[in-house]
Amino acid sequence: MNKDIKVAKQTISTEIQALKKLLASFNRSPQFSKVVNLISKIRGKCLVVGVGKSYLCGLKTSSTLSSLGTPSVAFSANDLQHGGLGAIQKNRDVLLVFSVSGESAELNSILQYANRNGIPVIGVSCKPSSMLLRYSTIKILLPKVVESGHSLAPTSSSLNFLSWGDSLAISLMKRKKWTNKKFVEHHTGGSLATALIQVREIMAKGKEIPFISSNKMMRPQ
């Protein structure tokens, strides 16, 4: 077998095992439903926060949430530390914080700010005793997994964060009874929007339809 293909298959196999662990973790905790309940009731936005690769996972999750009916904005922890905290609406918004270790120093002041101001925090981490989960209103503990390669960069853990975020977005969509029509209202471009357009939305109507008498000549007289 080609060496490159062998490495690729090993990588995917490792990540499949990580996803299996994530799937099994849902059977051991009711916390996920608490997250859905909380976010479905907020009057503002779900602000997704992370550092490094966790922020990039949060960025994708935030985009999916917004596409499927849950208004959301993503922030890097660094941006929040330098004025971004002003974007948080007290008594309206909720923070969804991603961090594998839950110990990123950039999160400390943000979590303290949220706690002081009564802003709900949903912490998602792989470390049960982490700073993030200690500060969190709802604690989501994802399984610790083997990273592909030599564990030099987040791989399997990033995949689990993305899958968990997709699960949340779809669950909220179902809870809110989000329809194809509403999806198109927020997704005006691309093949997805085109495929969901109904004929009555683009057809000519009334005076827009060019009528002509049946006894008219086709050539000008």
PLM regions and their residue ranges:
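An N-terminal, well-structured beta->alpha segment
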Residues: 1-41
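Internal, active-site/partner-interface "lid" segment
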Residues: 134, 148, 174-206
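Glycine-rich phosphate-binding loops that contact phosphosugars or nucleotide phosphates
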Residues: 40-176
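Short, contiguous, pocket-lining structural segments
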Residues: 31, 131, 160, 191-194, ...
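Bateman/CBS regulatory modules and CBS-like beta-alpha motifs in cytosolic regions of diverse proteins
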Residues: 25, 194-221
